[in-house]
Amino acid sequence: MKQVFLLFTVLFFAATSSFASAPASFGEAKVVAKREVFFDQADGPVGDLYCGCKWQWVGKSGGRVDAESCGYEVRKQASRAERTEWEHIVPAWTFGHQRQCWQKGGRKNCVATDPVFRAMEADLYNLYPSVGEVNGDRANFNYGMASSAAPQYGQCSTRIDFSERTAEPRNEVKGLVARTTFYMFDRYNLN
């Protein structure tokens, strides 16, 4: 009986130690997300978060957007429109600006001094590849209805209302965005 218990204990620890720990930084999270989460989704049916564009992986964690695959048209920033960027569905500003580290030096200070902030910034559930231009335009705007904003990116149905500081993601990902937002607010006790 002791041998069975010992064998079970060894197998349990071997199995649990094989699970990777969470990424320690945003930079590490981007690499892990590419390698272990989104590695096979660059030409999948969902595409990037905001426009459904396919992309090609380039470098450690980035990619090149295939604008023709989704009918994307550049609004203003051609260089950002060509690349994928890692979107924080719940922006770093949202989970960081109330923290003491942010008050004393912004995001850079939080990255350097606050392990809870680093965990939130690197949380893989909150990261998704997106067209860089749309990521930049969304900035730290809340999600909501942006029905008064005209389409800005060709056939991409995500809309940004700059005057209302609101971003409305395409219908296909609204559930993903909502679930991720609920997760982040619950997991990290955000207000």
Model-derived segments and spans:
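Aromatic-lined ligand-binding clefts that engage carbohydrates, nucleic acids, or primary amines
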Residues: S21-R83
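Sec/Tat signal peptide C-region and signal peptidase I cleavage site
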Residues: T16-A20
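Domain-level detector of nuclease and nuclease-like folds
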Residues: V74-E85, V90-N191
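Positively charged n-region of N-terminal signal peptides that target proteins for export
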Residues: M1-V4
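Bacterial N-terminal signal peptides
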Residues: L7-A15
